[in-house]
């Protein structure tokens, strides 16, 4: 196991995408559990999905005196530069991104702005945090995605695998983030760690994700479409496991070393964070149905069969995602392990409470 070399206590931590699903959960965990921490959250609160959920997440963070929220877009360089100048963050976690594989097919511009230009602005700000001999950013942690594996046939997906065949623009932007981070780590000695998240789910999640969208449709009496005739497998990973992994990774920055060429050996790492246990989409839907009935979101006599339609695979989709989490286990002694039923129960109970208000 690696020894932690970055303390979170008393630090100023910048979290981009703080009103997002993972971002808000990460802010909450840090503010709850870390002594003297100051969390600066930035989010543009786009209407890609229901802003009420984002506002609700921010409301739950506002009670912490160590939390400061800034509404702004990471694609705006001045906003980011001003933020770094004013607060001098010691740790940066970049979770702001235009998410969604299918949306990238119809709205490519927003992916270029947020995922490429936005991330470039973060890298530049990290680079200049060392100007004038300042200590600067100790560790940049950023979200990559399991989508970088594209249609790779070899499973489980390993971070040693070649990932040069993305099947969506979203995946291509995430692979680009890893390449950009590597270049900046090499040139400017910025310790950076990329995390390839695998199908994150849980309470107060993203309404565009399958489990949430299925629930909305079933409640409205609409038909749900199950892609690839139900033969897709996904490495569903509960949000608490993702956040636990992020917090552990934040505390070990890749070490700065000098290579034989006299230049820095890039202090750069990439890890998978997934459940290491892919679930068949039909099994997933069956468990979701049972938990929605249990939480009284749907009646016991609901006719699920009449509301299911098996359809072909969609453009940009892949048949399976499956994370090899061995390096994460070896380096941090941690592996996501929340069973699907436990996670979906937490979601169903949240949904029942949230929509009954």
PLM region descriptions:
Residues 132, 141, 150-154, 189, ...:
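Proline-centered turn/helix-capping motifs that create local helix->coil transitions or kinks
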């Amino acid at each position: 196991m690696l020894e932690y070399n970055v303390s979170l206590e008393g630090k100023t931590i910048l979290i981009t995408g703080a009103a997002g699903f993972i971002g808000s959960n990460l802010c909450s965990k840090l503010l709850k559990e870390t002594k003297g921490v100051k969390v600066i959250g930035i989010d543009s609160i786009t209407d890609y999905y229901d802003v009420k959920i984002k506002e609700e997440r921010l409301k739950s963070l506002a009670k912490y005196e160590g939390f400061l929220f800034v509404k702004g877009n990471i694609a705006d360089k001045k906003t980011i530069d001003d933020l770094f100048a004013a607060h001098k963050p010691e740790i940066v976690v970049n979770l702001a991104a235009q998410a969604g594989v299918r949306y990238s097919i119809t709205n490519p511009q927003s992916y270029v702005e947020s995922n490429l230009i936005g991330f470039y602005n973060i890298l530049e700000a990290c680079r200049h945090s060392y100007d004038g001999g300042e200590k600067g950013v100790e560790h940049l942690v950023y979200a990559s995605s399991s989508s970088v594996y594209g249609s790779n046939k070899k499973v489980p997906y390993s971070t040693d695998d070649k990932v040069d065949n993305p099947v969506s623009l979203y995946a291509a932007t995430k692979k680009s983030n890893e390449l950009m981070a590597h270049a900046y780590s090499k040139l400017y000695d910025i310790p950076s760690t990329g995390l390839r998240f695998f199908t994150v789910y849980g309470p107060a999640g993203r309404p565009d994700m399958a489990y949430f969208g299925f629930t909305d449709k079933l409640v409205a009496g609409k038909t749900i479409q199950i892609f690839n005739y139900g033969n897709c497998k996904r490495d569903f990973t509960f949000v608490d496991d993702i956040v636990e992994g992020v917090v552990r990774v934040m505390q070990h920055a890749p070490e700065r070393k000098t290579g034989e060429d006299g230049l820095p050996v890039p202090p750069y790492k990439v890890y998978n964070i997934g459940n290491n246990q892919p679930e068949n989409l039909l099994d997933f839907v069956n468990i979701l149905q049972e938990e929605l009935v249990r939480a009284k979101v749907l009646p016991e006599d609901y006719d699920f069969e009449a509301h299911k339609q098996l359809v072909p695979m969609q453009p940009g989709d892949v048949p399976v995602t499956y994370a090899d989490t061995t390096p994460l286990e070896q380096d941090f002694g941690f592996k996501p392990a929340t069973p699907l039923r436990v996670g979906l129960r937490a979601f169903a109970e949240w949904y029942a409470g949230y929509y009954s208000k």
